[in-house]
Design a protein with these regions (language model features):
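ABC family nucleotide-binding domain
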Residues: 2-211
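Conserved beta-strand-loop-alpha-helix hinge in the C-terminal portion
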Residues: 207, 215-233
């Protein structure tokens, strides 16, 4: 059994008299430690998939298996525990607490889980060893995003879920952030899932899940993912 599996997953929304199908019979599998890109245009349903995998939303039908457990059967309390213990989130905007230092922002993880990584070492791992005591306003956009990644991985999550993580960053800074995410997968064993509309990022992934019109249109496996250093986008 794969580490993550979505099987015949559907998500529907009701808007007035209109039913919107956000996910239509979604099927895919992801292995532990892979860097996966979910690729598609706006409205393709990829963020809905990410929200369901992260326990921030629930599907209406089908299975969502994480490490052998079907989280689609979880109640609200079980989903909260799952989000707290097993999932790290990185978004396009950094969501840092402005009156806490970089180190204090990452230390928030230790208030959520019992086996959190050391905040200082985690920030060193993302290249911010000299910025531990800086506040978010004193950091560049790329540095703030690295703090948000450090905060997410400090929880030791089963899944690191990233929604357009470089969407607000310049080219060079975006590559630095992608390098960190690729290293988390390759060297730390993290299972990293990135949602993006940017098809140029596909070569860095172990697996690319293409979405179109609320469904998975194709899946490709890269036997030799491209190193970030050589990526042009």
């Amino acid at each position: 059994m794969a580490y993550i599996e979505m099987k015949h997953s559907y998500k529907r929304y009701q808007t007035g008299y209109t039913e919107i199908i956000a996910n239509n019979d979604i099927n895919f599998a992801i292995e532990k430690g892979e860097l996966v890109i979910i690729l598609g245009a706006s409205g393709a349903g990829k963020s809905t998939v990410l929200n369901i995998l992260g326990g921030m939303d629930t599907n209406d039908e089908g299975q969502v298996l994480i490490d052998g457990v079907d989280i689609a059967k979880y109640n609200a309390k079980e989903l909260t525990t799952y989000r707290r213990n097993d999932v790290g989130f990185v978004f396009q905007f950094y969501n840092l607490v402005p009156n806490l230092t970089a180190k204090e922002n990452v230390e928030l993880a230790s208030e959520i889980v019992s086996d959190a990584r050391d905040a200082k070492q985690t920030l060193i791992d993302v290249g911010l060893g000299k910025r531990l005591n800086n506040f978010p306003a004193q950091l560049s956009g790329g540095e703030q995003q690295r703090v948000s990644i450090a905060r997410a991985v400090a929880k030791n999550p089963k899944l690191l879920l990233c929604d357009e993580p470089i969407g607000a960053l310049d080219y060079q800074t975006g590559k630095q952030v992608l390098k960190i995410l690729q290293d988390m997968s390759r060297h730390k064993g993290s299972t990293v899932i990135i949602v993006t509309h940017n098809s140029a990022l596909a070569p860095i992934a172990d697996r690319v899940i293409h979405m179109h019109d609320a469904t998975v249109s194709s899946i490709e496996v890269n036997e030799h993912p491209q190193d970030i250093e050589t990526l042009e986008y």
